[in-house]
Amino acid sequence: MKQHTLQLEGVTLDVPNQNLSSNEKYARLINGLTADFKSGNVYAFMGTSGSGKTTTLETIAGLVPSGSRTGGRILVDGQERNPDEFPYEFAYGDQLGYIIDELTVEEFVYYYVVSSLPEESKERVREKMDEVLENLLNIGHIRHNKMKNISGGEQKRANLARTFTKMLLLEGELKVVLLDEPTSELDAGLALKLGEFLRDYARRSNSIVLVTVHQPGAELYNTFDNLLFMNNGEKLYLGPSRDFIKFLGTKGIHNDGGPETNMEFLFSLFTKGSKMSKKYEKQLEQIAKEMNEEKKEEKKLRTSDDTEINFIPNLYVSFQMAIRQIIIDWRNREILYSLAMPIAMALFLVTGKYIYKDFSIATIKASMLSLSLYYVMNPSGLMNDKHYVTEESNRKLYGAAEVWFSSLISDTLVSILKYCIFFGIIYAFGLISMDHAFLGQVLMYTLGGTVSSMLFRSMASPLSTLGKVFNTTMVLMFQLSGALLGAGALLGALTLWISVIPEGSIPQEEIDAFISNFFDSTGSTGSTSIFSKVGSWVIRFICLVPKVVRSFLRILFLMFHPFAFFHSSILDAEKSSYKLFF
């Protein structure tokens, strides 16, 4: 089995300074960290709070705060990390995690894994998920409970179940496992069980397992092969975990309390202002000096905004996200609440007809426009700033392209449902007949409202995933604007022509007369006759486009209109008198 290596070479991380009392633009969290890790071993990252252990783990995973500066290199098997291969080479589970209230534990784990590994079969995903829930984490009995109805410790285990399921699916292929405090909030017995599982997994899968821990008990500590102890963003020790106390002894630092107090001694030693830190202040300064001498020359820092964005979505992942979102919105009644507006609007029109005895198609069209504007200002689903979308996209579970496409799918389906209810009510009360079909405008309003809402939210939050895509798209549009200006103007003109001019409103005789008068007035003779012929054909083509497009839209209407199958005359498209645009 091939051996894998993970190398950190002078890794440096500066993040935007949040300290308002400081004039420094950046705060350094990792300072020239160099370390080598080998497969088949479990490495514990330890240190006091703020020492940089979690930040180092996140940096290895590529989770760098926006606007940060980075330096150094992170190599896997001697090569820079490949973003496309990251989901299949790395597994990352963080300390805080997140929950999705309306999903069950089983759904929470399942949708995460299938989005992360779309090529895996559903059967195999469920098999490994069952093994984790039932045998490893002991939460099989709550698998059908909603996430919001279980305890904090159970939510912690549900988050772990996602990472552990992925680990089992990629056993033998996974190169690096990153876990941020997986044993926190767990009882000692389960924590020890997980420690032993990670040690065994590293051996049989030949993976590099990196785990942050705060203050483990002696038994859990003994399950770790090696230790990286950090202080103030710097490496203090990297080597066998059992030898750390001996290492400190060689530097003149001794624990007089015995082996059973080693953990308390270590954290007292590196807590600023404590009795032990004052006692061994000079020795600690000497250790830090020696470690600084190992650092390589610091290279130019890069900004974290230099990130490529993939504009091609994974269709399977997008559909899974859309399905999950529809389930969530149905269970939290968001879909039901959103139906109130079209129902109210339809009933308002019905009331108006019977009170004022007057009604026009324009009133329905105005109501449709009002509904579309309402949906733009009151988005639902994935477009409504869902926290878990940010969390999952930050973890590279999917990209911005999948977010956009899944948003389009889920919100479009729900919007079509709303419009169907709207039309169903006014049709039932006789406000419209089967000769009035609005499919073209429904599609335009639905897609226009959905896309507009996404753009508005992207502009409002430029540092969000959607915001970055929007900004990148705008840059590309400006770069291509010169080449596309003519084509865009022509397309806009054709669209306006199709939308505004009804079919048959311009008789063929008038078109012929217009062409003849136009070219006669320009004095086109002799050498300009070719121009006259070409120009006449162009105008004829423009006048023909609305008919072609309307024929295509009629086919769509026959396929998708909710009342189509209840009306016999639609079976003959040539005889139908439906007008998709008014």
UniProtKB/Swiss-Prot annotation:
A GO cellular-component term linked to this record: membrane
Membrane spanning stretches: 335-355, 359-378, 412-432, 436-456, 482-502, 551-571
Residue numbers binding ATP: G47, T48, S49, G50, S51, G52, K53, T54
Limits of the ABC transporter domain: 15-257
Domain (ABC transmembrane type-2) ranges: 316-519
InterPro entries on file: AAA+_ATPase (IPR003593), ABC_transporter-like_ATP-bd (IPR003439), ABC_transporter-like_CS (IPR017871), ABCG_transporters (IPR050352), P-loop_NTPase (IPR027417)
Membrane topology: Multi-pass membrane protein
Subcellular localization: Membrane
Protein name: ABC transporter-like protein ECU11_1340
Organism: Encephalitozoon cuniculi (strain GB-M1)
